[in-house]
From Swiss-Prot:
Heme b b566 binds at residues 97, 196. Heme 1 (or BL or b562) is low-potential and absorbs at about 562 nm, and heme 2 (or BH or b566) is high-potential and absorbs at about 566 nm. The cytochrome bc1 complex contains 11 subunits: 3 respiratory subunits (MT-CYB, CYC1 and UQCRFS1), 2 core proteins (UQCRC1 and UQCRC2) and 6 low-molecular weight proteins (UQCRH/QCR6, UQCRB/QCR7, UQCRQ/QCR8, UQCR10/QCR9, UQCR11/QCR10 and a cleavage product of UQCRFS1). This cytochrome bc1 complex then forms a dimer. This is Cytochrome b. It comes from Glossophaga leachii (Gray's long-tongued bat).
C-alpha cells in the first residue's frame, strides 16, 4: 500500500515540499537561512498575537499599555522582548539570505528572486509600522520623518501624507491604522512566502558550485530537516540570550520616553536594520533625490540578474568577484555605522562616498570584473 503522505491531498503537498523534495547534496549552512526566516516569522506572529491581546492603539494609552504588558502581564516582558529582538534576528537572517543569493548566483531564478525582493519590502514596511506602536519619542518622530518623505512625490505628495496620517500630523488616527496594518502584514508575508517556495520548487535549489546538480540529489528528509533543526536551536539560543541578558542592546533609550510632539530628540534615527538605507537617504541633500536613492538601494537588487555577465553562476570559483562582494559588505557596514551618527563632518562625506560606492559596485564594478574574469579564463 502506498504511504498516506503520498496520497492524502494535503499531506502530499507537505511531502513534496519538505519530505521527498530532491535537494542538491552539497548545500552549505548558508542554505539554512530560508528555514530560519520561517521560524522567525512564526515567532513574530505568535508573540505579536499575544501582545495584541493586551495592547491598546490609542495615543493616550499606547505607551502605558506596553508598560502594563512588561510589568503586570505574566511573562509579558518575555513576549515584548522576544518580539522586539525577534525582529532583529529576522533582519539578520534576511540580509544573510539575500547575501547568499548574491554570492552564489541564486538570483538567476528570477521569479523566486523578485518575490524575495517583494518580501523584503513587505517585512521592512511591517517592521517600520511596528516601531511606531509603543508610542515612545523615537516611535513618534520616526513615524513623522519617514511618512513625511512621501511629500517629496510631485503634485500629490502633500495630500498623500495627510491621507496616510488621517489628519494634519501623526496622531491617534495614524497609530490606529498602523496597528491594523502591522497586524495584517505578517499574514500577507506568510502568503508571499508560499509563492516564494512555489517558484523555488519549480526549479529546485541552487548549490554552492552554481553547477546543475540534477544527477546528484538527496531527499530533503532526513538530511536537511536535521540540519535545519540544528539551525533553529542555534538561532533560538542566540535570541534567548539576547532577550534574557541584554534585551535593550539593540533598542533606542529615547523610546522609553512617552511621545512628545513639542520636544524633538537630538538624533532621530530608525532601528539598526534600517540604518544603511537611512544613511543613503541622508547622503543626498535633495528631498526627492534622497527618497529615490532610498527606494533604489533595495530595488537595485531587481536588476542584478540582468547585470550578470559572468559565464559562471556562482562566485565560488571567481576570486576577483569575491573581493568585490566582501567590499560591498564592508560598504554596507560603513553605511550602517554612518546612519547612526549625527549629520556633521566627517560623517556626511563618508556617507556620501559609501553611498556612491554602493551603487557603483553593484551596477558597474561587478559586471566589469565578471567580464574580466571571463577573459582571464579564456571563455
Amino acid at each position: 500500500m502506498t504511504n498516506i503522505r503520498k496520497t492524502h491531498p494535503l499531506l502530499k503537498i507537505i511531502n513534496s515540499s519538505f519530505v521527498d523534495l530532491p535537494a542538491p547534496s552539497s548545500l552549505s549552512s548558508w542554505w539554512n537561512f530560508g528555514s530560519l526566516l520561517g521560524v522567525c516569522l512564526a515567532v513574530q506572529i505568535l508573540t505579536g498575537l499575544f501582545l495584541a491581546m493586551h495592547y491598546t492603539s490609542d495615543t493616550a494609552t499606547a505607551f502605558n499599555s506596553v508598560t502594563h504588558i512588561c510589568r503586570d502581564v505574566n511573562y509579558g516582558w518575555v513576549l515584548r522582548y522576544l518580539h522586539a529582538n525577534g525582529a532583529s534576528m529576522f533582519f539578520i537572517c534576511l540580509y544573510l539570505h539575500v547575501g547568499r543569493g548574491l554570492y552564489y548566483g541564486s538570483y538567476m531564478y528570477s521569479e523566486t528572486w523578485n518575490i524575495g525582493i517583494l518580501l523584503l519590502f513587505a517585512v521592512m514596511a511591517t517592521a517600520f509600522m511596528g516601531y511606531v506602536l509603543p508610542w515612545g519619542q523615537m516611535s513618534f518622530w520616526g513615524a513623522t520623518v519617514i511618512t513625511n518623505l512621501l511629500s517629496a512625490i510631485p503634485y500629490i505628495g502633500t495630500d498623500l501624507v495627510q491621507w496616510i496620517w488621517g489628519g494634519f500630523s501623526v496622531d491617534k488616527a495614524t497609530l490606529t491604522r498602523f496597528f491594523a496594518f502591522h497586524f495584517l502584514f505578517p499574514f500577507i508575508v506568510a502568503a508571499l512566502v508560499m509563492v516564494h517556495l512555489l517558484f523555488l520548487h519549480e526549479t529546485g535549489s541552487n548549490n554552492p558550485t552554481g553547477i546543475p546538480s540534477d544527477s546528484d540529489m538527496i531527499p530533503f528528509h532526513p538530511y536537511y530537516t536535521i540540519k535545519d533543526i540544528l539551525g533553529f536551536l542555534i538561532m533560538l539560543t542566540a535570541l534567548s540570550a539576547l532577550v534574557l541578558f541584554s534585551p535593550d542592546l539593540l533598542g533606542d533609550p529615547d523610546n522609553y520616553m512617552p511621545a512628545n510632539p513639542l520636544n524633538t530628540p537630538p538624533h532621530i534615527k530608525p532601528e539598526w536594520y534600517f540604518l544603511f538605507a537611512y544613511a543613503i537617504l541622508r547622503s543626498i541633500p535633495n528631498k526627492l533625490g534622497g527618497v529615490l536613492a532610498l527606494v533604489l538601494s533595495i530595488l537595485v537588487l531587481a536588476i542584478v540578474p540582468m547585470l550578470h555577465t559572468s559565464k559562471q553562476r556562482s562566485m565560488m570559483f571567481r576570486p576577483l568577484s569575491q573581493c568585490l562582494f566582501w567590499f560591498l559588505v564592508a560598504i554596507l557596514l560603513t553605511l550602517t555605522w554612518i546612519g547612526g551618527q549625527p549629520v556633521e563632518y566627517p560623517y556626511v562625506i563618508i556617507g556620501q562616498m559609501a553611498s556612491v560606492l554602493y551603487f557603483l559596485t553593484i551596477l558597474v564594478f561587478m559586471p566589469l570584473v565578471s567580464i574580466m574574469e571571463n577573459h582571464l579564463l579564456k571563455w
